[in-house]
Swiss-Prot record:
Keyword tags: Disulfide bond, Hormone, Metal-binding, Phosphoprotein, Secreted, Signal, Zinc
Source organism (scientific name): Spalax ehrenbergi (Middle East blind mole rat)
Protein name: Somatotropin
Function: Plays an important role in growth control. Its major role in stimulating body growth is to stimulate the liver and other tissues to secrete IGF1. It stimulates both the differentiation and proliferation of myoblasts. It also stimulates amino acid uptake and protein synthesis in muscle and other tissues.
Molecular function (Gene Ontology), one example: growth factor activity
Localization of this protein: Secreted
Amino acid sequence: MATGSQTSWLLTFTLLCLPWPQEAGAFPAMPLSNLFANAVLRAQHLHQLAADTYKEFERAYIPEGQRYSIQNAQAAFCFSETIPAPTGKEEAQQRSDMELLRFSLLLIQSWLGPVQFLSRVFTNSLVFGTSDRVFEKLKDLEEGIQALMRELEDGSLRAGQLLKQTYDKFDTNMRSDDALLKNYGLLSCFKKDLHKAETYLRVMKCRRFVESSCAF
């Protein structure tokens, strides 16, 4: 492995292992730039995990000829499509940081229940088998977003006052066609929602700390 790649991997691993700061006064405050960097790395990691799991599930269970029609039917399936959250980078840039943090938190919290059933669905998955702590990873990102909200608190509407909703749990009966389609749809939403959360966090980080990685 090249020295540059090795250094980059070690830096990413170190940042992913860093704990979030606790309530004010418990520990010295972490710089805001570090809070954003940690949150973005965690969101990227979860989004990649969701995308890999979705692709593996698709290869294993969904015939290639049926994928396009099923994906079209899933277009309005995700509950996140029913909330006024930005759908892309351009729309996200029009929202305040607190709005984006609230939407990110809502998206993450909507998956905390369903993902606890993932390990039962993907017991033999090569992708999921190496990442069976997805619930803990989501909780970690939730804490990071809450830490950012505490730092940026502006006294406006709190995230807890937003309408909260969760997805159905994953179906463990993998012999049922209905269960396969349900899980396929849930994984699609999981991937989309984590992509949104990652996008929101990257937009916030880039406009606060101008850097070359803002082009995404």
